């Protein structure tokens, strides 16, 4: 349902430009991935599940690199690579407190100075998402979009 992407599209229009690199943590069927690719210079998407839709998307667009595996394994194996740095990190993996917190903490070192951290499912349905974000960024303003996407400027 494309209406579910209205908020992410608003986020992209407001904050993403065609010089930016994005790390997407959790791609599922690649619907949000395709939208991120439309706006950004380059998108690296990580997911532990392999979906044919992602393979088809990777063939269709020239600015997507999909990495299959666990977030921690892929990030740890690439963390010394200076080219594995991002202007925006979009977190949409598991939605419980522990996983959201871990996803944010392991990805933050990959964020370029002045980069943006964002994600999905900031809603009462997933209280762990909000709890982890507020704990890690206690003094940051959180911008919430209509599809429950969220964004923090990492100043």
Question: In which residue ranges do the predicted regions lie?
Answer:
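S-adenosylmethionine/decaboxylated-SAM
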Residues: 2-155
């Amino acid at each position: 349902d494309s209406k579910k992407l209205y908020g992410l599209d608003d986020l992209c229009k407001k904050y993403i430009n065609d010089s930016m690199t994005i790390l997407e943590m959790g791609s599922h069927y690649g619907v949000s991935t395709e939208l991120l690719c439309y706006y950004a210079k380059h998108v690296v998407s990580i997911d532990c599940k392999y979906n044919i839709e992602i393979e088809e998307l990777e063939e269709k667009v020239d600015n997507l690199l999909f990495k299959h595996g666990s977030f921690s394994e892929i990030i740890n194996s690439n963390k010394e690579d200076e080219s594995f740095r991002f202007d925006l990190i979009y977190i949409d993996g598991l939605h419980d407190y522990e996983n959201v917190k871990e996803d944010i903490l392991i990805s933050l070192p990959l964020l370029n100075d002045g980069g943006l951290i964002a994600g999905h499912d900031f809603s009462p349905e997933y209280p762990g998402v909000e709890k982890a974000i507020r704990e890690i960024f206690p003094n940051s303003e959180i911008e919430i979009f209509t599809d429950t996407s969220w964004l923090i400027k990492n100043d």
